[in-house]
A protein has these predicted regions:
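C-terminal beta-strand-rich structural cap/linker in extracellular carbohydrate-active enzymes
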Residues: 639-659
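Conserved alpha/beta catalytic core and glycan-binding cleft of carbohydrate-active enzymes
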Residues: 100, 104-107, 321-327, 334-519, ...
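Substrate-binding/active-site clefts of carbohydrate-active enzymes
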Residues: 93, 123-133, 142-299, 308, ...
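Hydrophobic faces of well-ordered beta-strands that scaffold small-molecule active sites
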Residues: 137-141, 180, 228-230, 303, ...
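C-terminal accessory region downstream of the catalytic core in glycan-modifying enzymes
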Residues: 529, 542, 550-552, 614-641, ...
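Aromatic- and carboxylate-lined catalytic core of secreted/periplasmic carbohydrate-active enzymes
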Residues: 533-574
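Surface-exposed beta-strand/loop patches in extracellular or lumenal glycoproteins
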Residues: 15-22, 27, 605-622
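The feature marks proteins involved in alpha-glucan
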Residues: 1-21, 44-45, 49-138, 147-156
Length: 659
């Protein structure tokens, strides 16, 4: 377990260092006060022998309180079987340092092990509760993307916990999001990238900040009513000290049978999750300890599990989910919690209570809904076509909005969907932007508009245009940029009124674009948000304001925290590939159409524009209806000559009304 305290049992700081190693090993610890770095020589450091733990011959320990140490902060590392040239860091270290290599740090005060205290007493403020899973709007935050190098041309992410707290949190609070999904912040060799290759599972990345700074970040989020969901990598590890201590018990070799049942290793070491000959699963225990530590020490409000497909072990993931929930409920019985899987095989069934799942129960609470992203992008590119023998376009639209089923474009058929909005995390873009159909949504919308009018829509051209809106871009380019932002507003209308938990990638809220080639797997991870683009033009700021309106609606309107949805209009030729593409739906909150406290969404997903369009209407008092996040230029809602209403609908435009 983490080498600092009995965090579950509340017994305070543990004086022992404990690490796993192969049975029969000789394990020594060598250490020195960090203030002695002017005489840095690890070979001359004090050394002590660890002893095997009684009844656990694959664990070794030493009692630091018994060493008679003077007060100080000590860096330490382990030596296995006398090989001084290959020191090993503590895989359970909770506080690390870097100087000629990575090491853990333990602290001694008055001859006993000590650690810096952290006050959580002021964690919450009046009027800022943590919202439940049905009210969430998640902000996906690659920490390193939150700040770029001063030399703008370099595009290197340098985000830290401190920068986000003091530069961005208030703005995110004003935007209205109430959860942050942190891309991995545990220490990783991929320090300038996303961090999907953890080295130390119990310590934050040194380049992002110290443990106290990550705790302060979480506390500052909680004070603003923002939950923090930790993205954790359990499929594999990169340069993790466990590999030096006991590789065979924690990781797979190419000859292991389990290896053939697993996915990509991404150039790292795959964890071993099948039981060994003795029925033991040390790698599972390692991950369960990690969950406990992040919950109790960092007050995690949930987890996002990377590479569910690659782990390919539903029973273990269910065990992880159940254990995390139990620890969280024990520590914070009145707080919400969630475990989300990233399953690129898109199996909504893992969120269901069904006999085929392990123990007949759900495996995770929620999953990323890839199908929503893909179908929405087909909507805005005019590619949501119907074919003979396949479901009608209106069915595909229903599934996209409600999540009742999901469309698999490879098999060209529908698959099981979701039973509750909290089971699906919907999004326009995620951090993984490599393929053309995955790139930032603003690039996706703007590129074809430029190309249709004879301009180029490459990453470099869009970057140039976005950065020269006030000087250099011609009137046509300026217009097309504004048109793309208007279509992005419409995409947010769909995202924030569909059934599911909406997630927004950092920067999408104001239409940020790629600065680097997203097709390059390295560059795609090193492309920080350009915050200056929030005010690159009045249209960018206007989009941010409209998104804030929609988020406020999503988090406060009762109809959007429930599942009930009724489609009350499709154009008669909607299912024809040449027909008008207008439809309308209502989030009813379970009441009949025409009741108060309902949300109405009118959508045109075709290339035709309508200065005047009539649809049926069930709500009598137009004066009691508010339009939310309206387009900059539109005809207001008005009664027509019959029993409906009339409004304008531009191409690929969505309009949202609240009763």
């Amino acid at each position: 377990m983490p080498n600092d305290n009995h965090y579950i049992h509340g017994a305070g700081i543990d004086s022992r260092l404990r690490i796993p190693a192969s049975v029969g090993s000789r394990i020594e610890v060598r250490f020195a006060d960090v203030l002695q770095r002017d005489r840095y020589d690890p070979l001359s450091w004090r050394r002590e022998l660890l002893t095997p733990v009684v009844g656990e011959p694959d664990w070794f320990e030493i009692d630091l309180d018994a060493l008679g140490l003077e007060d100080g902060d000590y860096e330490y590392e382990f030596i296995k079987n006398g090989v001084d040239e290959a020191p090993i860091a503590d895989p359970y270290a909770v506080y690390i340092t870097r100087f000629g290599g990575y090491r853990g740090i333990f602290q001694i005060r008055q001859g006993r092990r000590w650690r810096q205290s952290f006050t959580w007493d002021d964690e919450f403020t009046p009027g800022n509760p943590l919202r439940n899973n049905h009210q969430l709007v998640i902000y996906e935050m690659p920490m390193r993307w939150m700040e770029s190098a001063p030399e703008k041309a370099r595009q290197v992410g340098l985000g830290t916990f401190e920068k986000v707290v003091f530069v961005h949190l208030d703005q995110l609070k004003a935007l209205g999001i109430n959860a942050i999904e942190l891309l991995p912040v545990q220490d990783s060799p991929d320090t300038l990238n996303w961090g999907y290759g953890t080295r130390f599972f119990f310590a934050p990345d040194l380049d992002m900040g110290l443990p106290v700074e990550l705790k302060f970040f979480v506390k500052q989020c909680h004070q603003r009513g923002i939950r923090v969901i930790f993205d954790v990598v359990m499929n594999h590890a990169r340069n993790c000290p466990l590999a030096q201590l006991d590789y065979a018990r924690y990781f797979l070799s190419s000859e292991d049978e389990e290896r053939s049942h697993r996915g990509e290793d991404y150039g790292a070491s795959l964890f071993r999750y099948w039981p060994d000959a003795a029925g033991l699963t040390p790698a599972r225990e390692f991950q369960l300890h990690m969950a406990e530590y992040l919950i109790t020490e960092y007050h995690a409000d949930g987890f996002r599990l990377d590479e569910f497909k690659g782990i390919n072990h539903w029973e273990f993931i269910q065990q992880f989910r159940d254990h995390a929930w139990q620890v969280h409920q024990q520590a914070y019985p009145d707080r919400p919690f969630i475990v989300i899987a990233e399953d690129s095989w898109r199996r909504a069934a893992i969120t269901h209570q069904r006999p085929q799942n392990p123990n007949g129960r759900k495996v995770t609470d929620s999953i990323w809904n890839f199908a929503f992203r893909d179908e929405l992008r087909r909507v805005f590119s005019g590619r949501l076509d119907t074919a003979w023998g396949e479901p009608a376009r209106r069915e595909r639209v229903r599934w996209m909005v409600t999540g009742g089923q999901t469309w698999n474009d490879w098999s060209r058929q529908a698959e099981a969907g979701f039973h509750d909005l909290s089971q699906a995390v919907n999004y326009l873009t995620s951090h993984d932007v490599e393929k053309d159909d995955e790139k930032r949504i603003m690039n996706y919308l703007l590129a074809p508009l430029l190309e249709e009018r004879g301009y180029r829509g490459t990453v470099d051209d869009i970057r140039w245009l976005t950065d020269h809106l006030e000087s250099g871009a011609d009137d046509q380019q300026h217009f097309l940029h504004g048109l793309a932002l208007e279509r992005l507003r419409s995409a947010f209308c769909l995202l924030l009124t569909s059934v599911g938990i909406p997630m927004i990638l950092a920067g999408d809220e104001f239409g940020d674009v790629h600065d680097l080639d997203h097709h390059n797997w390295r560059l795609k991870m090193s492309d920080p948000v350009d915050w200056e683009r929030l005010d690159a033009s009045p249209n960018n700021r206007d989009l941010w304001n409209r998104v804030a309106e929609l988020i406020a609606l999503r988090t406060t309107h009762p109809a959007l925290t429930r599942n009930e949805t009724t489609f009350f209009y499709f154009h008669p030729d909607f299912d024809s590939n040449q027909g008008a593409k207008v439809f309308a739906y209502c989030r009813t909150r379970g009441a009949v159409l025409g009741a108060m406290d309902q949300i109405i969404v009118v959508c045109n997903i075709g290339p035709e524009s309508y200065a005047s369009y009539d649809i049926p209407w069930f709500w009598s008092e137009l004066s009691a209806i508010d339009e939310i996040a309206p387009p900059q230029h539109c005809r207001p809602l008005e009664h027509n000559d019959g029993h409906g209403v009339r409004l304008s609908l531009a191409a690929y435009q969505m309009r949202v009304f609240a009763t």
